[in-house]
């Protein structure tokens, strides 16, 4: 799953993982500071040096520099029988799609830029950071839509999670038929 900041990716993923025992989240690494109130396990928070060493060791499926912080998905090692969920930026989604054309990409958008702005402020982002994220979202949206298998607008969490569950179930049936 990919989408700009403030669309609710983490909240959606948490709900999906709780609902579907056959999903496994590959926890992303980041060098950014943990936000106030953010769960300890939202990411694996590491230093830039640790992150760069992991890059050197070939330990990431994909990684990107996003607004001065590094984000990366460690090479997944899902338990047997589980489908891996990646919660990644658009740059990372492009890398994953290049590596695995069969990877399913669901791109999530906010109902409006105003709502996105409100969500970003609500999680404690500064005005400057919010403006950077909104500009980045404008730039990423056409790319995300172009590479996505599905595009969803998260205007209601329960509906979005239900729709994602239906998509995952449908894709599993297609894969197994």
Positions of the model-derived regions?
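The feature captures the helix immediately C-terminal to the Walker
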Residues: 13-14
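ATP-binding Walker
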Residues: 6-7
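Walker A/P-loop
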Residues: 10
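Small-molecule kinase domains that catalyze NTP-dependent phosphoryl transfer to phosphate-bearing small molecules
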Residues: 125-171, 176
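ATP-dependent small-molecule kinase phosphotransfer cores
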Residues: 30-84, 91
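Conserved phosphate-donor/acceptor-positioning beta-strand/loop module used by diverse small-molecule
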Residues: 85-89, 98-123
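Post-Walker A helix-loop "phosphate-sensing" segment adjacent to the P-loop in P-loop NTPases
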Residues: 17-26
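Hydrophobic anchor at the beta1->P-loop junction of P-loop NTPases
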Residues: 1
């Amino acid at each position: 799953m990919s989408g700009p900041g403030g669309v609710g990716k983490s909240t959606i993923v948490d709900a999906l993982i709780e609902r579907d025992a056959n999903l496994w989240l590959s926890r992303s690494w980041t060098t950014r500071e943990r936000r106030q109130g953010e769960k300890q396990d939202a990411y694996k928070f590491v230093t830039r040096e640790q992150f760069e060493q992991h890059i050197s060791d070939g330990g990431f499926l994909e990684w990107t520099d996003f607004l001065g912080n590094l984000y990366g998905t460690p090479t997944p090692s899902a338990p047997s029988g589980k489908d891996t969920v990646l919660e990644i930026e658009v740059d990372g989604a492009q890398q994953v799609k290049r590596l695995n054309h069969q990877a399913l990409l669901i791109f999530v958008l906010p109902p409006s830029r105003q709502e996105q702005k409100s969500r970003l402020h609500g999680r404690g982002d500064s005005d400057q950071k919010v403006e950077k994220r909104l500009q980045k979202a404008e730039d990423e949206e056409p790319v995300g839509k172009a590479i996505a298998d599905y595009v969803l607008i998260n205007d209601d969490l329960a509906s979005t999670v239900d729709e994602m569950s239906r998509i995952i179930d449908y894709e599993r049936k297609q894969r197994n038929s």
